[in-house]
Amino acid sequence: MTSALSACGGKGSNIKEENVPADSMAYSIVKKAKGDSTLYGLACDGCTDSVVVFLPYEGGDPVTYEIIDARRLGKVFGRPKIGDRLALLVNPEDKEEALLVINIDELKGAWCNTFMPKFRDLDKMPRRLQRRMMADMPDSIKQKFLVPKELGFELKGTNTITPIGMRMRAETTDEMSPVEYPKQKRYREWRIYNGHLLLATKKHGIDTADIVLLRPDTLILRFKDKEQGYYKKLKY
C-alpha cells in the first residue's frame, strides 16, 4: 500500500441475491468479487472536474479517465482527493472514460435520519377519525409520546455496518408503548458491486441501493421502493 500511495503522490462477507454471487460481500481492496466490473483504486494528483487520475489496486501506473459526461449526468459521487479510495465504472466502449465515480472514503461514516413515531393502529382508522383523534389529543400526551428518534448506520472501512439508534432486541416497554417507529433493517455488511451499494442483513438477504447524492454532509439512496435521505453524524 505504501508504494501505491507513493505512486499517487499522497496519503494513503457472504450473501445471496439474484445475479450477485454468494461470496460477493467478501470484499477485498485487492481482489474483486466475482462478476463485479467495478474498478477499485486510489485517487492521484491531477484529479479535476473533468478527469480523475486513478491508481488501480491491481498495480501498474496511474490511469487518467475523462468524467465530463459522468459529472453532467450526476454520476460523480464525492470529490476525489489524493489518496482517497475510489470505485469506478469504465465505459466498455471507451476505456478512457469513467461512467461512474464513487469516493468510498466519503461514503464511509455514520449516516442518520430523524424519524417520528405514529400511534399504533392509526392507519386502520379512516382519515377523518385520524385527524379528529390528533386534534382532540392533549398536547401533553403528544409531547410525551411523539418524540423523534435518530436512526441510521455507520459504514465502516472493513465493509461492516454498525446500526445507530436501534436496540439489539425488542423490549417489553416497546411493545406496551402506544406509538411505534418505522421499522429499520439491521444491516451488517456493505460493499460496492457494479456501481450499486449492497446492504446485507443477517436474516433478510441484501438490499440494493443506488447513490443519488453524496456530499460531505448528505447521502441520498434510491431503494427499490423509495428514496431515503441521511445526514452525516460526526459523533454518536
Tell what function each PLM region has.
Residues 106-108, 182-186, 216-236:
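Edge beta-strand at a domain terminus
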Residues 77-80, 97-112:
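N-terminal helix-cap/turn-to-beta initiation motif at the start of protein domains
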Residues 49, 90-97:
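Short, charged beta-turn/beta-strand-edge "cap" motif at the junction between a beta-strand
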Residues 73-87:
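Short nucleic-acid-contacting surface segments enriched for D/E, G, S/T with interspersed K/R
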Residues 20-42, 46-50, 60, 123-193:
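N-terminal glycine/threonine-rich, aromatic-flanked beta-hairpin/loop signature
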Residues 9-11:
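Bacterial signal peptide processing site
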Residues 4-7:
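C-terminal motif of bacterial Sec signal peptides marking the signal peptidase cleavage site
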Residues 61-77:
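Beta-strand/loop nucleic-acid-binding surfaces
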